[in-house]
Structures are given as C-alpha cells and as structure tokens.
C-alpha cells in the first residue's frame, strides 16, 4: 500500500493495523544532537491515548513508546528514528459480524473496492489507531521547533456538535477530557455526551490549532505552499472533512478592505490570512480550523450491503469513540508540528544564508 510516508526532508513512514501486534513509524531527517528520550514522546501520547474518560472508547491501551534506533546517549544521531507502540487490548471478536458487511460511513467498502480484500478487525489500517504514531513523531518535531525557534503549538476543541466553545484560557485545555479552553462549559459538554451515548449515536466536532513563533519565510511556492501542506496534513487525519486557514470560509463574505491584513511598523493589524501569504509564513500566528465528522461506528441499525451486494441491516458492536473529535486535538497539533518541521529544514536548505534588508514586524500590534 503506497501513501504511507509524509514529508520531504523530515519524513514519517508509519506501519501497523488496529488489531495487529504493534503500530510504529520510522522518522527520518531529524537533525543530530536533539536531546530525546521516551518520556519526551510519552507525554504527548498520554494526551491522546484511549480509555481516559467515559466519553471516549474504552479500549485500554497504555500506548507505551519504544525508541528502537536513532538515539544514542540521550541524543538524536541524525539517522532514522524507529518508534514502536505495541497493541495490548485488541478485541477482534467484536468485529466478526462485519467481516462480510460494510459499515455506512466507514472505509470498509472503499478499501474492498480498491484492494479486493480488507482487514476488518477494528478497521485495520484505516483505523485512527494509526494516529498514535503520528503523535509520537510529532513530539520529536515539536521539541526541535520549540528549542530551535521557540515555536509553540496549541490546539483545542472549539465546538462539540451544536455547542460552540468560547476560548477563555489556554490553562483550561489540558484540565478536561474535551481539551476545551473553557472549564465552565465542561458540565454542559458532559451532559450532552451522556445523552448522546444513551441514544446510540455519535457527533462531530471542530478543532482549532495554532502555532506561534514561526519565523517569516517558511513555505515553498507554488505547489508546496505552507497553507496547502497544512491543509493536506489535516485532511489526512481520520474523519476530518474540512480545513480552514485563518478566516477560511468567512472570507467569502468579507470585502478586500476588511480581509487584507494591514501592516504598520508596529505590526499587523489583523490576521485574516492565518499567518500565511503567498504560501509563505508571515511571522504571524498560524491559525487552522478543522471539521471532524461524527463517528461512523454506531450501535443503531442502518441500511447497507454485504460482500455479495445484498441489502442488509448493520449495527456496529465494539468499543468506539462517540465523538472522535474529543481525542483529535493532540493529533492535529502533531500534524502541524510535522509540517512546520519539514518546512523549517527545507527553508534552511535553500534560503538559510538569505539576509533580508526589510525589518520583520510583529505578528500583531501590541
């Protein structure tokens, strides 16, 4: 199966299936000398792992990462970094009833049409289980970006189904199961999810992720524009159906006099562009929003077909997230880190010696 490698200079090649013995990845292109240990990666994996609240899948996976190569005496060597996460709580018997059927909204039908065969256990390769290794790889990129440039990446849930979540404080994000930047709204989110779970249904979400401290100049026009690669990365996350950069679709209703971010010696007046102009970073905050569809695995009976093309009714058993968006924040952060890391190295390779006479202005007016 092709399409398993992400990146140009900083690459991640992942492998494994939801119910296989392990998942993992090979990270290539990491500069030597970065202090790195398993604890650096584990901290990010623990934010994403399943079974952490009643509102997510109850599959219990410790998601313990093993560094197999590329690190010696606590520092990266510049050679490929092998990462492995062993699966420990597979329950494949839950999927026996869908071996010959297709779940509505899932990749089952598409995989069968493409390959003529599929691993039906937990979705196999199409499962969001694979995103654990993206988070692991993203932790490496995130650490290098922060230490080298001071880049800070932060994501949060900005809507759960019909409930908009106003941003109040970044300090609240890691203090609740939803990654909500507003502690006061958590009881409402919990009540909504409890009611939803009883109805045997699922719901979508909106995730916002930002990056501050990104220098101006990153991005490779015209086909590898920074915003295009960010959108590509986010659309590669399971269940993501839409991505916005900056004002996004709100740009449709804006006038040019409003949308164009005015510049002053003191900084940019606004950030409708989301930190990218002409496919190149401006030094402003990079702002990304993504729409995540409702979980396709629900216990309600729905119409479908079997492998013979016959009409059937199918209800999905097993342990599933009633809202996959609840655990998507660390994944979105990781993918943004991977894109920025790749473009930092690409910029250094081609334009590392460029000295611009025009002074940099702040990302926003103080």
Swiss-Prot record:
Reduced FMN (FMNH(2)). This reaction introduces a second double bond into the aromatic ring system. Homotetramer. GO terms for molecular function: chorismate synthase activity; FMN binding. NCBIfam families: aroC, PRK05382.1. SUPFAM superfamilies: Chorismate synthase, AroC. CDD domains: Chorismate_synthase. It is an enzyme of class 4 (lyase). Keywords: Amino-acid biosynthesis, Aromatic amino acid biosynthesis, FAD, Flavoprotein, FMN, Lyase, NADP. Pfam families: Chorismate_synt (PF01264). GO terms for biological process: amino acid biosynthetic process; aromatic amino acid family biosynthetic process; chorismate biosynthetic process. FMN binds at residues 125-127, 238-239, 278, 293-297, 319. Its cofactor is FMNH2. Belongs to the chorismate synthase family. It catalyses: 5-O-(1-carboxyvinyl)-3-phosphoshikimate = chorismate + phosphate. One of its GO terms (cellular component) is cytosol. PANTHER family: CHORISMATE SYNTHASE. HAMAP family: Chorismate_synth. This is Chorismate synthase. NADP(+) binds at residues 48, 54.
